[in-house]
Amino acid sequence: DLTSMLGAQQQTGTTTSTASSIDTSVCTSGDSANKYTQCRMVATAESLDAVWTEQLPAQAGLKYAKPEFVLWDGTQISSACGNASSAVGPFYCSGDRTVYLDMSFFSEMERSLGAADTPLAEEYIVAHEFGHHIQHLTGQMAKADRSGSGATSDSVRLELQADCYAGIWVNHASSTPDPDTGKPFLNRPSSEEIKGALGAAEAVGDDHIQERAKGHVDSDTWTHGSSEQRVRWFTTGMNSGSV
């Protein structure tokens, strides 16, 4: 559970905006973060900011610059990286340093991919996209050749590293305080909550998606990594807490 949250337009945090009818005006407290999915996403972004503001300088010697954060409902949306729809799902655009979170993806992840309907499973998705922002800040994204595919491609390596960064957030979130309240944003996850997050990582593995959609697996076309790889690297970050 999220214990506290900052306002959606807090000046010291990531600026959250919406590109649809999603209402963030109700996001005023920890209670609303635990009640409304959109508020939990805002609070998760604030927690990610707090964790990376501490950890990126401490571990990599780099200053953390906060991304923009846009909530949308799967309808058409424009970014510096082009137009997107629900077929794309959540994504990070380095061109405008923005995390675009398609809120409709969560029901798709649960209904079509078999992921658990748990808060930490959804928060993992946000943390993964913020992981791509970390890659942009460190220069790792610019160095990678994202044109290829396959289990050992740079595209897959970037995705697995973003999973690891998501795990690093889980490791530190329950001990990183909200600068306004002094209390951590996130209570220490239970074993069941962690199981749900691991299930989400497994559900978005390329092999799992291909098996459900086509009945067979083609590793040469992978762009995100297998279920086993994604779970392993998320777990690595969660256990180590180290970049």
Mark where each language-model region is.
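Catalytic Zn2+-binding segment of zinc metalloproteases
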Residues: F130-R146, I168-W169, A173-S175
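Acidic helix-start/capping segments at beta-turn-to-alpha-helix junctions
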Residues: T28-T37, M41-S47, P57-A80, K183-S190
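Catalytic zinc-binding patch centered on the HExxH motif and its immediate surroundings
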Residues: T75-D102
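Long amphipathic alpha-helical segments used for membrane anchoring, targeting, substrate engagement
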Residues: D1-S20
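Short helix/loop segments within enzyme catalytic domains
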Residues: C39-A45, D49-V51, Q55-A58, Q161-D207
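Short pre-active-site segment immediately N-terminal to the catalytic Zn-binding motif
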Residues: S107-Y124, G150-V156
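Active-site recognition of the HExxH zinc-binding catalytic motif
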Residues: W52, L101, Y124-L137, E159, ...
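Pan-zinc metallopeptidase signature
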Residues: G205-V243
